[in-house]
């Protein structure tokens, strides 16, 4: 699992965490690394307009690799 290059939208994080039944991030907290690595914010995009909908239907846990890579916003 790679380090996110941007901060996730608060709504997406809440949906993912609630689906997983926890309050902790999906992986260990790399918040400082994320901020240090986010120089332009250009990488913080969803590659599909359905990302938020997918998160609300459980795709964060069903397909975490795709969601982390393609649904970053």
Swiss-Prot record:
Location(s) in or outside the cell: Secreted
Superkingdom of origin: Eukaryota
Pfam families noted in UniProt: ShK
Primary localisation category: secreted
Propeptide stretch(es), residue numbers: 18-35
Tissue distribution of the protein: Expressed by the venom duct.
Domain ShKT intervals: 44-73
Residue ranges of coiled coil: none
Post-translational modification: Contain 2 disulfide bonds.
Molecular functions per Gene Ontology: toxin activity
Span list, region Disordered: 22-42
Comp. bias intervals (Basic and acidic residues): 27-38
GO cellular component, one term: extracellular region
Keywords noted in UniProt: Cleavage on pair of basic residues, Disulfide bond, Neurotoxin, Secreted, Signal, Toxin
Cleaved signal peptide residues: 1-17
UniProt function note: Probable neurotoxin.
Free-text comment on this protein's domains from its UniProt entry: The cysteine framework is XIV (C-C-C-C).
Stated name of the protein: Conotoxin Im14.3
């Amino acid at each position: 699992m790679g380090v996110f290059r941007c901060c996730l939208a608060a709504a997406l994080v809440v949906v993912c965490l609630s689906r997983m039944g926890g309050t902790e991030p999906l992986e260990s907290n790399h918040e400082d690394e994320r901020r240090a690595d986010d120089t332009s914010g250009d990488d913080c995009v969803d590659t599909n307009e359905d990302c938020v909908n997918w998160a609300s239907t459980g795709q964060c846990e069903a397909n975490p690799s795709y969601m982390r890579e393609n649904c970053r916003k």
